[in-house]
Each structure stands twice: as structure tokens, then as C-alpha cells.
């Protein structure tokens, strides 16, 4: 059975079981080969899937000499460093932020907290006042604040906002428009989540990575960055098969060589390098993605594709 047949079987399951899915598609390195929408196609909030775009922007910035993985957070924002700053604060690097190992060891600035006003009005000042609990680089702790700090380091180095930088270096080259992006109280795009994207454009990110950093022959991001960002950089505490390691703002997936950009409620792009395929799905906030859709996606599409 081919990939399209497997896809069609999964679509039939969605319909017969009334699974809470908005859209699903498969692409190879060149084009979408199968796609199905259950609601009108539109840009939607893809939550933490955003983090993988920020990783890509940072990879481009590193290639351009604006940053390095060893760039220190405090060097980007010396004016925010408290007079009684911990030694550990000065040890936090871009690498630590990208691997969710800053040492804060707490899930700061996650979506519910942001929406309730935590950290406002100045996320940088808020995070610089938090205690670094463990040695940077020693412990994985998933936190949108780490992504936000990495994004602000890029903005500082590039001299522009994240949306502007990503448009010039990434989106415009993929024939995408200016990104709609939720911002913090000071107008900075939230690197931890909040970009709005169509299913087809989510797939494009995966296709660039599937093609080792190119889009229809044009180099977008270095092959070296693709391999680093999509490879396991740090172990993650095991809670289920989906927590099997983390790269630079990409999750590892439980299939050979596979990884994913993963946003809340089921906004996910999975890259399957061995099969030369990318699978993307969008789901509603009202659905139980983790307990209903994710197991079905695994058992009825991703496992058959990778068998």
C-alpha cells in the first residue's frame, strides 16, 4: 500500500470516528501529494510549532555571523543584569535556550500565564529577575520563556523584530506573506508560540528540512543547522513515546530519524527523512488531541508510513 492509500485510509477513519481534526496533508520534498480539509482552509494559531521557525531563523543568523550557539544571554542585554546576579545567569547561552536547558528549571511564560498577564509588561526584566535553579545545560525543562529569550537575542543581534527577520530570510523565499504573529506587551513577537500559519505553509517548513535546508534548489538554511536542529541534543524525561529527546526547538519522534515541530492542541509537522515525506496536521482547541487524535495519527498513518 502506498502513502496516498494510507493517507486516504486515515481520512476515512477521521470521518467515521468524527475525530477532532481540521486538516491533514502529506508532502514529499517537492509538493503536497495528498491533502484534506474538514473546515475552511485558513491561517490559524499553531502555538509552539512557532518555536521551530525561531530555531530556523537562529540557524540562518548563525550562518550570517550574527550569533553563535555560545553567545551569552547577559551579553545581549547587559542593562537587564541585576547588580546581585547569580553566577549561573551569566552562564546561560543560546545553546541552552534552544535545548530548553537554561537552568531556570520552571515552565515560565507558557500560554495560560501570558494570557493572564504574568511577566507583563517586560518579559526580559521578568526573566532576569527569576532564580536560575540548576546549572545551565544540565537539565531539560520545557519552557516557552527559553524560546522567548532566544528570540530576543536574535532580534538584538539582527536589529529588527523576529517577523521582519523571518520574512526576509525565510517566508518571502517560500512565497509566503508577512507572518501574523501574537506579540508581547512591548510589541515583540512571542517566540514561544503565537504565529498563524496555513497547513500548506506548515508543510513548507518540513519540506525545507527534508531537503537539507533548501527550497526548490534555493539554499534557505545550512545543511549543518538542519542536522543539528533536527538531531537529539538533550534527553527529555520520559512520560510517553513522544518524549524521546529534543533538538534545537524540535522534538524527536518515535520513528527512525524522525522529528517534529509540535504546537498545542495538535498543530504538528512531522518530518520522516527515511521515507522522504512530511506529514502535517491541524486540530481544534476543543478536541482532545493527546488522547484521541495523536494515538490515531500514530497507529493509522505514521506507523504504516514508517513500517
Would you name each region that the model predicts?
Residues 7-40, 69, 269-270, 276-280:
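A short, well-structured edge-of-sheet supersecondary motif
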Residues 31-32, 111-136, 160-179:
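Short, charged, amphipathic alpha-helices and their helix-cap/turn boundaries
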Residues 66-104, 129, 157-193, 197:
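Active-site helix/loop module of the DD-peptidase/beta-lactamase fold
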Residues 149-153, 193-214, 267-282:
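Active-site-proximal alpha-helical segments within enzyme catalytic domains
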Residues 227-279:
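Active-site Gly/Thr loop motif
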Amino acid at each position: 500500500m502506498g502513502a496516498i492509500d494510507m493517507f486516504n485510509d486515515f481520512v476515512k477513519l477521521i470521518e467515521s470516528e468524527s475525530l477532532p481534526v481540521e486538516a491533514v496533508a502529506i508532502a514529499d520534498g517537492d509538493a503536497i501529494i495528498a491533502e484534506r480539509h474538514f473546515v475552511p482552509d485558513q491561517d490559524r494559531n499553531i502555538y509552539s510549532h512557532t518555536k521551530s521557525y525561531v530555531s530556523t531563523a537562529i540557524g540562518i543568523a548563525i550562518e550570517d555571523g550574527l550569533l553563535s550557539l555560545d553567545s551569552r544571554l547577559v551579553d545581549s542585554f547587559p542593562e537587564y543584569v541585576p547588580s546581585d546576579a547569580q553566577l549561573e545567569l551569566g552562564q546561560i547561552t543560546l545553546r541552552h535556550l534552544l535545548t530548553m536547558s537554561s537552568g531556570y528549571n520552571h515552565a515560565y511564560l507558557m500560554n495560560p500565564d501570558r494570557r493572564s498577564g504574568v511577566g507583563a509588561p517586560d518579559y526580559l526584566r521578568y526573566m532576569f529577575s527569576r532564580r536560575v535553579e540548576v546549572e545551565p545545560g544540565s537539565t531539560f525543562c520545557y519552557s516557552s520563556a527559553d524560546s522567548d529569550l532566544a528570540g530576543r537575542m536574535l532580534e538584538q543581534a539582527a536589529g529588527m523584530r523576529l517577523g521582519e527577520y523571518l520574512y526576509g530570510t525565510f517566508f518571502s523565499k517560500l512565497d509566503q506573506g508577512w507572518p501574523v504573529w501574537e506579540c508581547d506587551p512591548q510589541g515583540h513577537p512571542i517566540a514561544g508560540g503565537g504565529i498563524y500559519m496555513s497547513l500548506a505553509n506548515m508543510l513548507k517548513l518540513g519540506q525545507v528540512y527534508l531537503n537539507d535546508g533548501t527550497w526548490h534548489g534555493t539554499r534557505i538554511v545550512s545543511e549543518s543547522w538542519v542536522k543539528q536542529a533536527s538531531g537529539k541534543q538533550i534527553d527529555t524525561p520520559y512520560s510517553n513515546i513522544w518524549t524521546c529527546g529534543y533538538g534545537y526547538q524540535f522534538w524527536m519522534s518515535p520513528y527512525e530519524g524522525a522529528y517534529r515541530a509540535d504546537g498545542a492542541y495538535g498543530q504538528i509537522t512531522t518530518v520522516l527523512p527515511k521515507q522522504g515525506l512530511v506529514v502535517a496536521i491541524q486540530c481544534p482547541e476543543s478536541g482532545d488531541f493527546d488522547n484521541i487524535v495523536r494515538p490515531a495519527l500514530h497507529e493509522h498513518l505514521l506507523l504504516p508510513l514508517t513500517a
